[in-house]
Curated annotation (Swiss-Prot):
Annotated membrane topology: Multi-pass membrane protein
Localization annotation: Cell inner membrane
GO cellular component entries: plasma membrane
Protein name from the UniProt record: Na(+)/H(+) antiporter NhaA 1
Catalytic activity, as annotated: Na(+)(in) + 2 H(+)(out) = Na(+)(out) + 2 H(+)(in)
Alphabetized GO MF terms: sodium:proton antiporter activity
HAMAP family the UniProt entry points to: NhaA
Family matches, as InterPro entries: Na/H_antiporter_dom_sf, NhaA
Residues that span the membrane, as ranges: 14-34, 59-79, 94-114, 125-145, 154-174, 179-199, 205-225, 260-280, 295-315, 328-348, 362-382
Gene that encodes the chain: nhaA1
NCBIfam families in alphabetical order: NhaA (TIGR00773), PRK09560.1 (NF007111), PRK09561.1 (NF007112)
């Protein structure tokens, strides 16, 4: 329980740090003098040259393709542990977050599609309102302190894991470009080596690190989004140590090492790099376009309806139970909080419209607006739920 408590505390602190990073990005982007400095940082090219091999990218892509690969590697480690040893290691435990998570993907996607189906390019962003930012949601929960049952926080974490699985599948299937056969072959070779290492329960972290780097570069060059390399590599990190103990295995060690790096460095840097919205007259007027509207309605309306209605049906059909100590109002308030998309929605937005900046600032404003609405509304609903319970 102490491990979970520490985890939650770090996640909430990370959410606050992400908010500060986004505020700083907004200040820089909307200041006439500092905007140029901010833009030049994001466009600055850097990379590696080794003989004929060159890997040169601007800062923004190093963040989105590199640092976010580490983020997804960490998420993959969490998924593996939770499905094998943790909160999702049985059907009864996984039922409610799984069913609620499915609703939280389907309903927002349908709302976005209904508003944008007339234009084949616009509809590419259907996945933007389907994801959640757990760090932000946990930060809101912790503002309420001990008034919120620990079971509700654990349910949010379980729901976040299901949400991450959905995001991984969506990125792999719908946001992958043309493929390079040679790079895919190198990726396959790296995966084979990782499989052998895992089968033999090899405990040398440096071999896994080397294979992971080769896998990341080859996936990046293949046309598949590089963040998937992180997920793939994480699946091969040994769960148990040489004595068969999962609590002291490499997976737990790497998770504990990466957690503060992801929470306090990678996610704030990502937020700072992607949240620099210029509040121009055009970007404000473009909020009435179906794409930004689809994002706003998908996150604020679709998420809460999808998560709550699917969870409600699952409980009424005896497929799952309400978290201990929670009432329906708790569940509804949490459902609203899942609409806080922030960093993950910004990430999917960058993939969906990578070849165009037609909705660049309007989409970011829509994500910020909808996420803020969800955070504020969810906070007051949960506050009322805690008072009603007392």
């Amino acid at each position: 329980m102490n491990i979970i408590k520490n985890f939650l505390q770090k996640e909430s602190a990370s959410g606050i740090l992400i908010i500060l990073a986004m505020i700083l990005a907004l200040i820089l982007a909307n200041n006439g003098v500092l905007n140029k400095f901010y833009s030049e940082i994001l466009r600055l090219d850097s990379g590696i040259i080794f003989g004929e091999f060159k890997l040169i990218k601007p800062t923004i892509l190093w963040v989105n393709d590199g640092l976010m690969a580490i983020f997804f590697f960490f998420i993959g480690l969490e998924l593996k542990y939770e499905f094998l040893e943790g909160e999702l290691n049985s059907i009864s435990k996984v039922a409610l977050p799984s069913i609620a998570g499915i609703g939280g993907v389907i309903v927002p996607a349908v709302i976005f599609y209904v508003l944008n189906h007339a234009n084949r390019f616009d509809v590419n962003g259907w996945a933007i309102p389907t994801v959640s930012d757990t760090a932000f949601a946990l930060a809101v929960l912790f503002l309420l302190g001990s008034r919120i049952p620990i079971s509700l926080k654990l349910f949010l974490l379980s729901l976040a894991i299901i949400d991450d699985v959905a995001a991984i599948i969506i990125i792999a299937i719908f946001y992958t470009k043309t493929l390079s056969i040679i790079s895919l072959f190198i990726s396959f070779c790296a995966i084979v080596i990782l499989t052998i290492l895992n089968y033999k329960n090899n405990q040398n972290i440096y071999i896994y690190l080397l294979c992971g780097i080769v896998l990341w570069v080859s996936v990046l060059m293949s046309g598949i989004h590089a963040t998937l390399a992180g997920i793939i590599a994480s699946m091969f990190i040994p769960l148990r140590d040489e004595d068969g103990d999962p609590e002291h295995g490499m997976l737990q060690s790497v998770m504990h090492f990466l957690h503060p790096i992801v929470a306090f460095l990678i996610l704030p840097i990502f937020a700072f790099s992607n949240a620099g919205v210029v509040f121009s007259e055009d970007s404000i007027l473009n909020l009435t376009h179906p794409v930004p509207l689809g994002i706003i309605f998908g996150l604020f309306i679709g998420k809460q309806i999808g998560v709550f209605s699917f969870a409600f049906l699952a409980i009424k059909c005896k497929l799952a139970e309400l978290p201990n100590g929670c009432g329906w109002l708790h569940l509804y308030g949490l459902s609203i909080l899942t609409g806080v998309g922030m960093s993950m929605s910004l990430f999917i937005d960058g993939l969906a419209y990578a070849e165009s900046d037609a909705f660049l600032y309007a989409n970011k404003i829509a994500i910020l607006l909808a996420s803020t609405m969800c955070a504020v509304t969810g906070y007051f609903v949960l506050r009322k739920a805690s008072k009603s319970q007392n």
